[in-house]
From Swiss-Prot:
The entry's keywords: ATP-binding, Ligase, Nucleotide-binding, RNA repair
Role this protein plays: Functions as an RNA ligase, in vitro. The ligation reaction entails three nucleotidyl transfer steps. In the first step, the RNA ligase reacts with ATP in the absence of nucleic acid to form a covalent ligase-AMP intermediate and release pyrophosphate. In step 2, the ligase-AMP binds to the nucleic acid and transfers the adenylate to the 5'-PO4 terminus to form an adenylylated intermediate. In step 3, the RNA ligase directs the attack of the 3'-OH on the 5'-phosphoanhydride linkage, resulting in a repaired 3'-5' phosphodiester and release of AMP.
Identification of the protein by name: RNA ligase 1
UniProt-listed InterPro entries: RLIG1 (IPR041211)
One Gene Ontology biological process: hematopoietic progenitor cell differentiation
Known cofactor(s): Mg(2+); Mn(2+)
Post-translational events: AMPylates itself (auto-AMPylation).
UniProt cross-references to Pfam families, sorted A to Z: RLIG1
Amino acid sequence: MRRLGSVQRKMPCVFVTEVKEEPSTKREHQPFKVLATETLSHKALDADIHNAIPTEKVDGTCCYVTNYKGQPYLWARLDRKPNKLAEKRFKNFLHLKQNSKEFFWNVEEDFKPVPECWIPAKEIEQINGNPIPDENGHIPGWVPVEKNSKQHCWHSSVVDYESEIALVLRHHPDDPGLLEISAVPLSDLLEQTLELIGTNINGNPYGLGSKKHPLHLLIPHGAFQIRNLPTLKHSDLLSWFDGCREGKIEGIVWHCNDGCLIKVHRHHLGLCWPIPDTYMNSKPVIINMNLNKYEYAFDAKCLFNHFSKIDNQKFGRLKDIILTV
């Protein structure tokens, strides 16, 4: 199977979208909705969407694995945003022109400072070595997740840099109907993006862990391919999301042959998210966490150690996993 694309920028919707002046169900205090029309977008058609690989859009926070300090590291998303003065100028410009591409940015003066270790996301257009902000005036980028980081404590809980491993959820290699939680070498994930999900991420739509025993996992983007997706018609996709077990997901991301990623979210179709019973929680999950091969004493409180105590145990669904000290 070919390696699927990584998420380095905002993904366009598979359909042309329109704005409706009614309260959003996705974001509190947003007085409008962005809804899909029945017309496929030019970007989707240009990327040959009909021959793309559809995958589950997972609800978490985006991460990236690349080298830092001479070894593979997990990186957290950090968008560089304009300062107040530049943001005001940008909003006034949009109000008059409504085309963000015509706005002139001074990258060195218009943006808030970021840590020295910050890097811009790949595939970002550049002029004279400076990354160009997206249509929202943001420059997508990454910062490395340091060990014991307070700011990124949930990110750091799913990696161990001494053993160079990550805590990953994906399909069991021999049984597509079974999920597996295992320790994966960070080197195997180099230049991939992943989704961090769990107790303290995005309201925990998958019901993982608890406040007393938080649980977080990484899912490589494109890990959950969708079989038997209906045709790319608005009505068919709406029926699929609303009426079948496989449709109980946040959305779909199509991985196109040219590397382009195209999405549709339940909210684009006027459907709710989160929902009570997700497709991810309909599958059994097995723990594969034998740490004996690592010549290293894992911290007694770390997730890897907790999972090693239930190695080879099988659970009916993800939310049934309760880690105790």
